[in-house]
Curated annotation (Swiss-Prot):
Gene it is expressed from: mdtL
Similarity comment text for this entry: Belongs to the major facilitator superfamily. DHA1 family. MdtL (TC 2.A.1.2.22) subfamily.
Function: Confers resistance to chloramphenicol.
Name of the molecule in the record: Multidrug resistance protein MdtL
Periplasmic topological domain: 25-41, 90-92, 155-157, 223-244, 290-292, 352-355
């Protein structure tokens, strides 16, 4: 079992590493490529677009051909794209490399969640996804620090060579450690069960909405945090970095505590707690009389996301044994596209950073609480009872 957990964690971590590690080198990258930092900030959106594009096909291929045939090319593409970025001499080539990086990371991301669905029951999967969420929270803190240390002695290209090395590690794990987990092709008697795993299942759609809104909350916070903390609240750059590190610490602590909480409370209780924390955060930020109270509201955001997201993802994947890859892809596409659409629309309409965050917090909490309370899970899927995997 440990081999599946290690491989899944490694596959997922390419995604945040690809986002956060290069940011520290952005000024030098812009200077070398004769582009402005503003022009290269689009590299974040291009990377996410690559991930979304990969998710359009990766899930279906993973369900038809297996998890390894998607993970191995995905890791290989991430390696090639990282090297391509390091060799880019124009901003256009750099952005093309970032898109390819996103494609590779997206393939690996989809496979990771499908593997966890294949190998873990509902309760254990919720615990593992909560732990995975905590580990993922470490990357936005450690990756820029690692990038800074690398750039003390090496050029910005070394950041992408480091990502390539990470990709090589994931590729080796996928080739030699990971075993295929895709359920065997269903017999004729299992066809009704396969056909019943519809993506239009009300329970699944409700969890897609909940997780998409939750990701929109956390990405809105990350996207607006420089404006909120430095421009509006007046913190210096060093203080901003400290605050973000502390919020990551809150996220990690809550994420690592959630598996223990699942041994005491029902998953539904933790999901309700998550949304109540979001609502409390929105109200706190809306009426905050001081910076201290606002910072408390921000910690509620991090705690709310960490306590509920892994549980919601586990519930979303629960109904799917034979179509776990497609379900994972659907979740990923909805989360990436939904959160990006919200941030883009809010910017186009001219909603300020503060109101953007408050608005998504309150909307997420109200909609999600209604869905949690009124959309009950269907008949438990028996698919995890005995799954015969390909060797």
């Amino acid at each position: 079992m440990s081999r599946f957990l290690i491989c899944s964690f490694a596959l997922v971590l390419l995604y945040p590493a690809g986002i956060d590690m290069y940011l520290v080198g952005l000024p030098r990258i812009a200077a070398d490529l004769n582009a402005s930092e503003a022009q290269l900030h689009i590299a974040f959106s291009v990377y996410l677009a690559g991930m979304a594009a990969a998710m359009l096909f990766a899930g279906k291929v993973a369900d038809r051909s297996g998890r390894k045939p998607v993970a191995i090319p995905g890791a290989a593409l991430f390696i090639i794209a990282s090297v391509f970025c390091s060799l880019a001499e124009t901003s256009a080539l750099f952005l093309a490399g970032r898109f390819l990086q996103g494609l590779g990371a997206g393939c690996c991301y989809v496979v990771a969640f499908a593997i966890l669905r294949d190998t873990l029951d509902d309760r254990r999967r919720a615990k593992v996804l909560s732990l995975l969420n905590g580990i993922t929270c470490i990357i936005p803190v450690l990756a820029p620090v690692l990038g800074h240390l690398i750039m003390l002695n090496f050029p910005w290209q070394s950041l992408f060579w480091t990502m390539a090395i990470m990709g090589v590690a994931v590729l080796m794990l996928s080739l030699f450690i990971l075993k295929e987990t895709r359920p065997a092709a269903p017999a004729a008697s299992d066809k009704p069960r396969e056909n019943s795993e519809s993506l239009l299942n009300r329970f699944f759609l409700s969890r897609v909405v909940i997780t998409t809104l939750s990701v929109s909350v956390i990405l809105t916070f990350v996207n607006t945090s420089p404006v909120l903390l430095m421009e509006i609240m007046g913190f210096e750059r060093g203080e901003y970095a400290t605050i973000m590190a502390l919020t990551a610490g809150v996220s990690m602590t809550v994420s690592f505590s959630t598996p223990f909480a699942l041994g005491i409370f029902k998953p539904r209780t933790l999901m309700i707690t998550s949304q109540v924390l979001f609502l409390a955060a929105g109200i706190t930020l809306a009426v905050s009389p001081s910076h201290a109270v606002s910072l408390f509201g921000i910690t509620l955001i991090c705690a709310g996301f960490s306590v509920g997201f892994g549980v919601a993802m586990s519930q979303a994947l629960g109904p799917f044994s034979l179509r776990a890859g497609v379900a994972s892809s659907t979740l990923g596409i909805a989360q990436v596209c939904g959160s990006s659409l919200w941030i883009w629309l809010a910017a186009v309409v001219g909603i300020g950073a503060w109101n953007m965050l408050i608005g998504i917090l309150i909307a997420c909490s109200i909609v999600s609480l209604l869905l949690i309370m009124f959309v009950a899970p269907g008949r438990p899927v028996a698919a995890h009872e005995e799954i015969h995997h390909h060797a």
